[in-house]
Structure formats: structure tokens, C-alpha cells
């Protein structure tokens, strides 16, 4: 099958590799290289780098609105396009160019968590499970009919990083299975149960110890590794990256023992944290180099 692959971040790479091992990938579309690092030199995206490793042709248009870009896309004569966190809106002529259309791997069980940050939001909301969906793309935001889905439980200590990696592999396996079975009937999304995963705002990252422990724990895990939920310790901003619910109670922010902190209801034990300019470290290692005050702000 002739496939166009469209993706940009690390999440997309397992799907690209899985498809390239089984189908003819006629082109890989990714966002243009962006300035990154201390030198602010343009750096190709993870998908761009993976495509080059696989010897696949890469295209990096700024947008796909011009007749030239759309004509170049159609000229590839692809059977299908697979879109995984590409980051650009696809105009209708692009959506209609492959005879099997454009399929999207979305990291939620649609229609729950349409939008930009479905993994973060599922954890932060306390969802018991999530998954990946293969959706036939249309003009609306994640509104297309669903061809296939796979589910996974969200563990009590899962972070966004953990779930990201698991869902990326699940999506890769599911898209390979779906491509093998095309054409497939697609199930329209139900009108009930629609929620939107708004993009994460860094203002959401400051920890309020007055909230219930369950909410603080989900905030820490849901925002790990980026942007990282944080609190001030001795005037230093420290990111808290892993946690679990713990026994105990006290005034919000009070250090009960080790790195166990009282919340508005219950307590949270911090398992991993990151000081400014340092690598992430287990809580025990953090505590060897930093004394916690009696109470955190």
C-alpha cells in the first residue's frame, strides 16, 4: 500500500517505523526544523530524523494551503495518509487526495478528550482507562468516525511520560492492523460524552497544597515530565515528577516525613523530583542535598 505519513514528535515515531516495515511510504511530512538548544540551531523533528534513518523522502512545508503544496501532495498518488500529531491543519483537498482518505491516530477513546492534550487530561481528570483511536479525518477537530480503538488501564502511579510511551506503541500496532484490513466501516462518534483536552497552560503547574491529595497527585503525574508541577522549597522552584497517595494528614503543605506532604485532604508522597538546572532524581537523593522546611508554600 502506498502511504503518506504525517507526524512530528516522538509519539509519532513508532507508527512511522511500523508502517515503513510493511508498506511503501512514498513521503513523510513533518513540521520544519525549529531552533532548539543553547545555540538555537534549527533541529529536525523526531519524525524527520527517523525518516532519514529509514531512507524515506521528507517534506517540511510551513503549511499546506497553497495550490502548489496540495498539488504536490496529490501527485504522490497515495492510497492513504496516516497522521499522528502532525501539528498542521489539513485542508479539504489534502483530506480527499488519497482514495482511502487520511487516518489519524488519536491518544484517547473518542469522543472523550478531543484536542491537544488528551494524555495529560486523562490523568489529571482521574480517568480509570484511556486508549488510542484510529479516526477517519474530516474538517472538524477530532470529530471523524472511528475505525478501531485499543484500551489500557491508567495505573495509580502512571505519569504522562509512561502513558505517552505505552499509547505510542499501541497506536503503532493498531494502525498496522487497521491498514491491513482496509477498507473498513467507520463508526460515527456519539454525541454524548464529548470532552475537550485543552492545551496545557504553564499556569496550571503551580501546586496548591490546599487541594485534596488525589487532585495534587494527579496534577503531579499528569504534568510529568512537561511542564512539570512545581512548588517552592527554600525559594527554589522544584519540579515534582512522580508521586503516590500516602497515609497521614495535617495542615496543607506540612512535611509529615521524608517527602510526604499533607494536603487539604490526605497526603502525597513525592517519589521523584528535579531541582533547577539538575537532572530528575529519586526523592531520597533530593533529600540528601536539600533540607525540607517544616511546611511548603
UniProtKB/Swiss-Prot annotation:
Pfam families per the UniProt record, alphabetical: Formyl_trans_C (PF02911), Formyl_trans_N (PF00551)
Record organism: Paracoccus denitrificans (strain Pd 1222)
Protein's name according to its UniProt entry: Methionyl-tRNA formyltransferase
Family membership noted in the UniProt record: Belongs to the Fmt family.
EC number assigned by the record: 2.1.2.9
Region entry Disordered, spans: 31-52
Binding site for (6S)-5,6,7,8-tetrahydrofolate: 108-111
Gene Ontology terms for molecular function: methionyl-tRNA formyltransferase activity
Xref: HAMAP family: Formyl_trans
PANTHER family: METHIONYL-TRNA FORMYLTRANSFERASE (PTHR11138), METHIONYL-TRNA FORMYLTRANSFERASE, MITOCHONDRIAL (PTHR11138:SF5)
Domain of life from the UniProt record: Bacteria
Reactions catalysed, as given in the entry: L-methionyl-tRNA(fMet) + (6R)-10-formyltetrahydrofolate = N-formyl-L-methionyl-tRNA(fMet) + (6S)-5,6,7,8-tetrahydrofolate + H(+)
InterPro entries: Fmt, Formyl_trans_C, Formyl_transf_N, Formyl_transf_N_sf, Formyl_transferase-like_C_sf, Met-tRNA-FMT_C, Met-tRNA-FMT_N
GN (gene name): fmt
Signal peptide feature range: none
Keyword Repeat attached: no
GO (cellular component) term, any one: cytosol
Function: Attaches a formyl group to the free amino group of methionyl-tRNA(fMet). The formyl group appears to play a dual role in the initiator identity of N-formylmethionyl-tRNA by promoting its recognition by IF2 and preventing the misappropriation of this tRNA by the elongation apparatus.
TM region(s), chain numbering: none
Enzyme class: transferase
Record flagged with keyword DNA-binding: no
Keyword list, A-Z: Protein biosynthesis, Transferase
Amino acid at each position: 500500500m502506498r502511504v503518506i505519513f504525517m507526524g512530528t514528535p516522538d509519539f509519532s515515531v513508532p507508527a512511522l517505523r511500523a508502517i515503513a516495515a510493511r508498506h511503501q511510504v512514498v513521503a513523510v511530512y513533518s513540521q520544519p526544523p525549529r531552533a532548539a538548544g543553547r545555540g538555537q540551531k534549527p533541529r529536525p523533528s523526531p519524525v524527520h530524523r527517523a525518516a532519514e534513518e529509514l531512507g524515506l523522502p521528507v517534506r517540511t512545508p510551513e503549511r499546506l494551503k497553497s495550490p502548489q503544496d496540495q498539488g504536490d501532495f496529490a501527485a504522490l498518488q497515495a492510497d492513504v495518509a496516516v497522521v499522528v500529531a502532525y501539528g498542521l491543519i489539513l485542508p479539504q483537498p489534502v483530506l480527499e487526495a488519497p482514495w482511502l482518505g487520511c487516518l489519524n491516530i488519536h491518544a484517547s477513546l473518542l469522543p472523550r478528550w478531543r484536542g491537544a492534550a488528551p494524555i495529560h487530561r486523562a490523568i489529571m481528570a482521574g480517568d480509570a482507562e484511556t486508549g488510542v483511536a484510529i479516526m477517519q479525518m474530516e474538517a472538524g477537530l477530532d470529530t471523524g468516525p472511528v475505525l478501531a480503538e485499543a484500551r489500557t488501564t491508567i495505573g495509580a502511579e502512571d505519569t504522562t511520560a509512561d502513558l505517552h510511551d505505552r499509547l505510542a506503541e499501541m497506536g503503532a500496532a493498531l494502525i498496522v492492523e487497521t491498514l491491513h484490513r482496509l477498507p473498513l466501516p467507520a463508526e460515527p462518534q456519539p454525541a454524548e460524552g464529548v470532552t475537550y483536552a485543552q492545551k496545557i497552560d504553564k499556569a496550571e503547574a503551580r501546586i496548591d497544597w490546599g487541594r485534596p491529595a488525589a487532585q495534587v497527585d494527579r496534577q503531579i503525574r499528569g504534568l510529568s515530565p512537561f511542564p512539570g508541577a512545581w512548588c517552592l522549597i527554600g525559594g527554589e522552584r522544584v519540579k515534582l515528577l512522580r508521586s503516590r497517595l500516602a497515609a497521614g494528614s495535617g495542615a496543607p503543605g506540612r512535611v509529615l516525613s521524608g517527602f510526604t506532604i499533607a494536603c487539604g485532604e490526605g497526603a502525597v508522597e513525592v517519589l521523584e523530583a528535579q531541582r533547577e538546572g539538575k537532572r530528575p532524581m529519586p526523592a531520597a537523593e533530593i533529600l540528601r542535598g536539600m533540607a525540607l522546611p517544616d511546611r511548603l508554600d
